[in-house]
Amino acid sequence: MDKRILLPTDFSKNALNAIRYALDLYQDQVCEFYFLNAYQVNGYSIDTMMMFPEPGEPSYEAAKKASEGGFEKLMDILELHNDNPKHTFHTLSTFNSLLYAIKDTIAKNDINIVVMGTKGETGAASVVFGTNTVNVMEKVTECPVLAVPEVVRFVKPKEIVFPTDYKSVFKRKELNYLIEIAKYHNAFIRVLHIVRESDLSHEQQANKELLEAILKDTSHSYHTLTDHKVPAGISAFIESRDSDMIAFINKKHNFFGSMLSKPLVKEMGYHSKIPVLTMHEVSQ
C-alpha cells in the first residue's frame, strides 16, 4: 500500500526544506504526498469568534488565489528536485487554522505521517521550532509527526536516539514508525535512559525486556546517562555521537511522567537541531 505523507507548507524556505527532507527520506518508497496550505485572511482568525470572509468575498478570494499561486511555484521547484515516478503529489488549499486543517486532512486522506518544519518566530538562535510546529507535535495524535529544523539538510539516517525511562509498557504499534525508518535506512536505534540512579526497578526491567522483544529485528543498543537533567542529557548524547534523528513517544499528559516539570516535546522541540519524530501513546 502506498504511504500517504502530509506536508504542511506556508511556502517559506524552512517549509521547503522539510518537504525536500521528506522526499529524500522516502526516495525509494511508493508515496502519495499531500501538500497542505492552510490560509487565513489578515485581521481574521478561525480561532476567534470574529466573523470571517466567505467564498466570493474579495479578501477570501485574494487569500485563496495567493495560496494557489504559491502551489504553482512550489510544484515548479519540486520538479527540479524530485522527478520520481514512485511519488505522487496532491495540493490542498484550505481556509482554516493550521492545526484543524492538518487534523481534517489526516482524517479525510488516511495520512500515515506528517512532516513539517519551521523556525522559531522569536529569531533567537536557540529557538529552532516555532510554536506552530510544537503545537502540532503535541496535539496531532492521529499519526506520527516528524519535525525538521531549518538548518537540517538530508543525510541518510544512520542513528536514531530513543530516550525512555522504562516506566511505561511499550506497545509495538507505538513504535512502528521508528522501526520502519530504522529498517528502511539500516539505522541503529540508540535507546537512551537518563537517571539519577542506574538501577532499574522490577517493573522497569520488565518494560526494558518488552522493548528488547519489540526491537529484536532492528540494530539497536542501550545507553545510560546518570546525573543529567533530561533535555541536557539528551542533547549532550546526540552531540557526542552526531546522531541524525530523535524519537519520542508522547504520553497523554507529560513526557516521562514526573521526570520533568513541563513536557519534553516542548523542551526538545524548541531546541533540537536534528529532526524530531513524535509518536503517540496507544491506549489499547
Region roles according to the model:
Residues 15, 95, 126, 171, ...:
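A conditional alpha-helix N-cap/helix-loop micro-motif detector
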Residues 103-153, 240-241, 245-284:
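Gly/Ser-rich helix-loop-strand patches that form or flank binding pockets
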Residues 68, 72-76:
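N-terminal, Lys/Arg-enriched amphipathic/low-complexity engagement segments
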Residues 54-69:
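A short acidic, glycine-rich active-site loop
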Residues 90-101, 227-231:
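Charged docking surfaces used in two-component/phosphorelay signaling
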Residues 1-56, 159-224, 243-245, 271, ...:
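Small/aliphatic-rich secondary-structure junction motif
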Residues 80-90, 216-221:
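A short helix-to-beta-strand connector/capping loop
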